[in-house]
């Protein structure tokens, strides 16, 4: 959970959630965390520390550089800054936490040419990623302890990260011996997902990309679970993985909730609150705030995407039948569009469907009077309803769309206006998947 969210009273992991859910069926659930087991050793032989479980998290948001965590095998705690002035380094933290995360470490190349990969025998410098520190680690020769007080690389201890076991190899071996694989990827909101900092890209961290590749190679029967604060570019996974489930970081029962969805005990009905694009290269420049001209948001973007805004699946199937729309005049110059259809559950299981209503103007009565001609084809979400239907059940779904949801800003008149013309109303499963449409003339 994020630093503003309080402290969880307990936490159910996805592995433990699956164990509990599948216990009565006698299904064995085994797990590996994908972390490498390593020893941190001074290259001049004056000391070594560990073993640690090493995770490569990709780019940090507090100082945008590749970062790592080192979790002690002995006590399960993370290597963190402690002591007066945060100049001591000890394995005392339960989790990476806080606004300034003191459990993140950079592996800096001794050559000064950027980040080191932590390869066996490769000399590296250990540097705190915490903005208030940014100090290099060294071994205090008098005490033999790790401290973080070196201002420059010349005063820092050179280390090598000596591998004991490979986390990716362990995970791929486990996958090869399994009937089904649940692979969990994503981010930690303390490390690489919070406000104030934009990401440099949409790709998964390189270590997670490698893990995904090796696990899929070992066993293609994979369900990919992404626990994240934001979208990723997962084109390859979408093409190769049979099923993908996304969730936010949720709360203490995250593991139980995921297990209930994967086993079918709970029928999912969530919808994506943002578009998942195919990569950052297809997006406009981050500093370009011309939303319409540059093609930002689901309304104006023509960029290639993996999943559109509003996308989501269910174990149930639904049909959209008999769409209709009428105009109701409330007062002179103010109208309401009443749109309805019949929604039918055509499957053998109960479920929820999120019916989304989008509106777009397809032809102006007077193009010269159009307050915003470049946004003519933009779809706008004007309503949605989450409907529960039993197996074989059907129900009428009605939307009432007030005029202000259809109005556009006129810079010339400094007011919001309803452009007269022909409008299309789409009953959709997502922003790009209309299931039924109706047209109305509005003036």
Residue ranges: model-predicted function:
Residues 65, 332-334, 389-394:
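Solvent-exposed, conformationally flexible loop/turn segments
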Residues 140-142, 344, 402, 428-430:
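Beta-strand-rich extracellular modules
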Residues 10, 30-85, 103-143, 160-174:
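Extracellular glycan-recognition/adhesion modules and their associated mucin-like linkers
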Residues 405-422:
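Short glycine/proline/serine/threonine-rich loop/turn segments at secondary-structure transition edges
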Residues 32-33, 91, 98-99, 153-239:
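Hydrophobic helix-and-loop "lid/oligomerization" segment in the mid-to-C-terminal part
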Residues 367-409:
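Intrinsically disordered, low-complexity Pro/Gly/Ser/Thr-rich segments with frequent PxxP/GP/PP motifs
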Residues 1-15, 19-25, 32-34, 227-352, ...:
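Secreted, periplasmic, or luminal enzymes acting at the cell surface/secretory milieu
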């Amino acid at each position: 959970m994020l630093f503003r969210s309080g402290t969880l009273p307990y936490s159910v992991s996805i592995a433990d959630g699956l164990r509990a859910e599948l216990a009565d069926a006698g299904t064995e659930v085994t797990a590996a965390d994908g972390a490498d087991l390593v020893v941190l050793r001074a290259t001049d032989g004056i000391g070594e520390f560990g073993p640690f479980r090493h995770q490569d998290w990709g780019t940090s948001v507090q100082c945008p550089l590749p970062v790592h965590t080192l979790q002690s095998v002995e006590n399960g705690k993370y290597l963190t800054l402690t002591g007066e002035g945060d100049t001591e380094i000890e394995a005392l933290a339960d989790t990476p936490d806080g606004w300034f995360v003191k459990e993140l470490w950079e592996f800096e190349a001794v050559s000064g040419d950027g980040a080191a990969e932590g390869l066996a025998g490769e000399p590296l410098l250990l540097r705190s990623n915490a903005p208030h520190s940014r100090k290099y680690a060294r071994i205090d020769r008098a005490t033999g302890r790790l401290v973080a007080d070196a201002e420059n690389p010349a005063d820092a201890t050179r280390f090598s990260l000596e591998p004991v076991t490979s986390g990716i190899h362990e995970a791929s071996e486990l996958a090869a011996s399994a009937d089904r694989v649940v692979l969990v990827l994503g981010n930690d909101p303390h490390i690489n997902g919070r406000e104030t900092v934009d990401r440099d890209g949409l790709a998964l961290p390189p270590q997670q990309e490698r893990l995904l590749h090796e696990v899929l190679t070992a066993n293609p029967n994979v369900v990919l679970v992404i626990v994240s604060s934001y979208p990723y570019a997962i084109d390859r996974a979408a093409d190769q993985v049979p099923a993908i489930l996304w969730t936010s970081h949720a709360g203490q029962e995250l593991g139980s909730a995921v297990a209930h969805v994967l086993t079918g005990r709970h029928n999912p009905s969530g919808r994506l609150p943002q578009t998942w694009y195919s990569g950052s290269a297809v997006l406009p420049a981050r500093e370009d705030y011309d939303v319409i001209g540059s093609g930002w948001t689901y309304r104006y973007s023509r960029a290639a995407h993996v999943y559109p805004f509003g996308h989501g699946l269910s174990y149930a199937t639904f049909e959209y039948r008999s769409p209709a729309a009428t105009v109701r005049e409330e007062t002179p110059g103010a109208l309401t569009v009443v749109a309805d259809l019949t929604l039918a559950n055509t499957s053998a299981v109960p479920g929820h469907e999120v019916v989304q209503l989008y509106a777009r103007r397809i032809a102006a009565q007077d193009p010269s009077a159009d307050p915003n001609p470049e946004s003519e084809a933009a779809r706008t979400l004007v309503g949605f309803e989450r409907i529960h239907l039993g197996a074989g059940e059907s129900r009428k779904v009605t939307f009432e769309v007030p005029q202000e949801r259809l109005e556009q800003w006129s810079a010339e008149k400094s007011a919001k206006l309803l452009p007269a013309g022909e409008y299309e109303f789409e009953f959709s499963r997502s922003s790009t998947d209309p299931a039924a449409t109706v047209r109305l003339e509005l003036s």
